[in-house]
């Protein structure tokens, strides 16, 4: 992966601290790109049962740096358009440009089931009422904001920079 096909390019990866975002970050860093990982919580950790390993953004950033990338971690709630614009402006200010945007942030589900195991604290993104008509508006809004609007806001924020670079 060290062909440097993307040397001099800067990649923005939302939701880049874990899972697929981590994979994108490592792959792009391996191709020579500098990487900005934007995540709601850079300190959150995810345990991968198959590896028995604790992974968090610091780990991914260190792995990308080991591949030769300049790395920037930005903690931001991308469901807020102004916060997204500020995160992208910071990225461009610190890394010089934004050439690649991977909108990977997402999460939360709405499942319509009669029986769902709810944690003791009651915090869940799962609709436990069983029917679509009973799903709370707040839950639908949160899922749409997280999975759709973060992508829209990110694209809207990077577009002016990308247009200016062409």
Residue locations for each model-derived region?
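Rossmann-fold cofactor-recognition segment
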Residues: 62-80
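A short helix-coil junction within the Rossmann-fold of NAD(P)-dependent oxidoreductases
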Residues: 31, 94-95, 108-112, 157-166
């Amino acid at each position: 992966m060290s062909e440097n096909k993307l040397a001099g390019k800067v990649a923005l990866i939302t939701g880049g601290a874990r899972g697929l975002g981590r994979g994108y970050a490592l792959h792009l860093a391996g191709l020579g790109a500098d990487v900005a990982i934007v995540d709601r919580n850079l300190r959150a950790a995810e345990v991968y049962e198959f590896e028995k390993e604790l992974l968090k953004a610091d780990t991914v950033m260190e792995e990308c740096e080991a591949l030769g990338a300049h790395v920037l971690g930005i903690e931001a709630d991308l469901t807020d358009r102004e916060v997204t614009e500020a995160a992208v402006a910071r990225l461009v200010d610190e890394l010089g440009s934004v050439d690649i945007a991977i909108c990977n942030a997402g999460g939360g589900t709405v499942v319509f089931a009669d029986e769902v195991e709810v944690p003791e604290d009651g915090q869940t993104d799962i609709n436990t009422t069983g029917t679509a008509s009973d799903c709370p508006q707040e839950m639908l809004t949160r899922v749409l904001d997280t999975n759709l609007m973060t992508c829209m806001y990110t694209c809207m924020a990077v577009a002016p920079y990308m247009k200016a670079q062409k």
